[in-house]
Amino acid sequence: MKKIDKSKPVLVTGANGYVASWLVKQLLDNGITVHAAVRNPSNEKKVAHLKELAINSKGEIKFFKSDLLEKGSYQEAMQGCELVYHTASPFTSNYKDAQKELIEPAQNGTANVLESANQIDSVKRIVVTSSCAAMYTDAIDSVNAPGGVLTEDVWNTTASLDYQPYSYSKTLAEKKAWEMQEQQNRWDLVTINPCLVLGPPLNLKQTTSESLNILKMLGGGDMKMGAPKIGIGIVDVRDVAEAHYKAGFTPEAKGRYITAAHNSDFLEMGTVLLPKYGDKYPLPKKALPKWLLKIVGPMTNKLFTRKFVSNNVNIPWNADNSKIKNELGMSFRSLKETMEDSFQIMIDQGIFK
């Protein structure tokens, strides 16, 4: 059990990221000094929104140049911090070399941050942004889990370098974090394991989250003939930020926390938008048949292999979020609110032509 002093600075790695930006906002609004570690603090396009958040808050922000793969590059930013949030990790399906672009940055980056924590005596707690991907690869894995539901006790055993390497990278990175935590006794570790994160970004034009590509497909007409009923969990980015905040400052917080609000699917993501946006945008109204996806899927998207379609389409995704509700007092936004807020900001920014 660790009580964190709010007068001390708090480090956030990858501070300009999709989730991290909302976390920085919450920290600043609570009057906390944020040490924001980013790759290039002088890139105004990527940090201006964070500076603006600080101006309108009770807290303050200091920027530090840090790189996931550069050893020791977080040590300066970590000085004086009792609490460290490690959110930086790649999330992309547009890779050529999974080992170099996903596995190594995720695993070595986590080790790099935690090794720095071992050198900095002030650190008491590290909150790592992991993922539900460290628990499952495909929706069928949740069906096959004990009781047909994912819990914090479940680890991903089906991903590999060749199949769903993003899930594999998150699994290896989180396992590395727990392994390093067990080798010392000064700082404790909490992991936040979100499912698909949606919701309005604070810096849309610079947000590279894969989640937003799904919204572009929904609103841009890619799914106007129908959507694949891929079972998936959904959570709002603002709720994920709050979960991080509570995981850092709740002394009793411990272990892993599934951060999922809704057991849903791609079709429901579209149909929940129909009442408000259905007249103006080519949103999906029906499910694409599984047999069709098995034929055309591999031709339209490299991730849509026949194996992926078999393991995900028309298969429900179920996770138990009772631990985070009971231990951290989390409640979650409705799917309607999350989807409408996400969609509206993309309309406002002219994403759908």
Describe the predicted segments one by one.
Residues L215-Y257, A261-S264:
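Alpha-helical substrate-binding/gating segment
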Residues S160-L189:
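Active-site Tyr-X1-5-Lys
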Residues D162-P165, G199-T207, M223-R238:
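Glycine-rich "substrate-gating" loop/helix at the edge of Rossmann-like oxidoreductase active sites
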Residues K3-I32:
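N-terminal Rossmann NAD(P)H-binding glycine-rich loop of SDR-like oxidoreductase domains
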Residues A243-R306, N326, L335, M339-K353:
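Mid/C-terminal beta-alpha module of Rossmann-like enzyme folds, strongest
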Residues P90, K96-Y166, V190:
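Conserved Rossmann-fold NAD(P)-dependent oxidoreductase catalytic core, especially the SDR/UDP-sugar
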Residues P41-N108:
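NAD(P)H-binding glycine-rich loop region in Rossmannoid oxidoreductase-like domains
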Residues Q183-W187, G199-I214, A247-Y257:
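Glycine/proline-rich active-site loop of Rossmann-fold NAD(P)-dependent oxidoreductases
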